[in-house]
Amino acid sequence: MTDDILEVEHLTREFSVRGETVTAVDDVSFTVHRGEALGLVGESGSGKSTTARCVLRLIEPTRGTVRMNGVDITTLRRRALKDFRARAQMVFQDPYSSLDPRMRVREIIAEGIRIHRPRAKDSVVTDEIVELLEVVGLRPDHLDRLPAAFSGGERQRIGIARALAVNPELLVCDEPVASLDVSIQAQILNLFQELKATRGLTLLFIAHDLATVRHLCDRVAVMQQGAIREIGTREQLYTNPQDPYTQSLIAAVPEPNPIEERRKLTARRAAAAAKVAEGAA
């Protein structure tokens, strides 16, 4: 029997826009197994980030249930909701706007610890922060610097350390590498892979393309227009995608081998020509 840490059933989120109801998330259901990384992939406006925010109750679902460890978090209030927020944390997309520019690194990372463990001694908190900085690839002498002193990749590492500070079981990552240079993206993805392996973290990883999740995620769910079009293992989606939208995402993944890329391009052109010929007949 699979141990599911997260169960999402019939999740729907509607917004009122100029007097009309817009459905951003439309009857979405999926599970996340404990210790795995599930990728949630789709183009801008597909509803993936809204889904992530509903999962963490950063916004309230219109309908549906979200269970973590068997508990429906949509019904939680006050202390129970606070406890849930220690078990599930988010890493945001923009490392520039997600950190308070007036707070030093030690204050940013300590904030969650102070909320969930208000009696923790200052020396203990400092030791934990130093350890977290080392875990994410930063140095102890970064403690008293402001966010402006860091690059985008370093700021994202600070954001990851902040999320880890309360020892979560689930990390929801909302396009955490989308704003970074390609070389830095690889480093951050490797960090998530390492955290998953060494800390037993479960990841719900949001991305806008399949290339980003290719080496990190165990399973992938593809979203379009608020609904999940296809979900399966990484191997299933990359080798035998069933939904036409998934197939288009696969076709858009860059191929590092130029010979293989030409082969794929030739195959796509041949398939397109065959469809045209079939229509003409």
Protein language model regions, located:
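Conserved ABC transporter NBD signature motif
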Residues: G64-D72
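Conserved ABC ATPase signature
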Residues: L146-F150, E154
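Helix-to-loop junction immediately C-terminal to a conserved catalytic motif
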Residues: L56
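Short catalytic/signature loops enriched in Gly
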Residues: T2-D4, T21, I231-A281
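Conserved catalytic motifs of ABC-family nucleotide-binding domains
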Residues: N167
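Conserved ABC ATPase "signature" region
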Residues: D72, S123-D141, I250
